[in-house]
Amino acid sequence: EGTNLMGEVAGKEKPEVLMTLAELNRLLEADLKGWPQYEWKDGRTLVIMRQGKRYEIDTDKKVLVYVFPIAKGAQNVTSNGQELLAYTKANNLYYVDANGNEFAVTSDKDPNIVNGQTVSRNEFGINGGIFWSPDGKQLAFYRKDESQVGTFPLLDINSRMGTLREIKYPMAGMKTQQNS
């Protein structure tokens, strides 16, 4: 419905307005003309990454639950549902508290050692490589040793002149990574 975020509510015949763009702009202190990319954390918490921050918004109460600063280059970002955020930068894993203090979980210098990233290309129904305990106090993650895996060239067509970028890719019948 234009500038409204709509949702189906069990037992109701018509979709309901979950949040308006005006409400979102008020919470983000922004002047968005349309809805940014978002994902659902649970049935009522909306997650938006914008301008170096991760916003968690309670759509029922129309309030910001958490605002996390995100380091430049952070990937695989995940929240513990409380006041901690974990992510990867390069091949290492970090977490940050609600005050923006960053802590290194790993410090591997070898580019063949990858922490906190998906293994096996999101196969077997597992998405991601960082997992919070149910109480949000402990962090589990995959550690992948790709030192025996061959490289595979990919063509990056986003640049004006296509450029090659190499990734580690275990071809069938060849050595694969060791996960721990």
Language-model features, listed with the residues they occupy:
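Beta-propeller folds
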Residues: 1-180
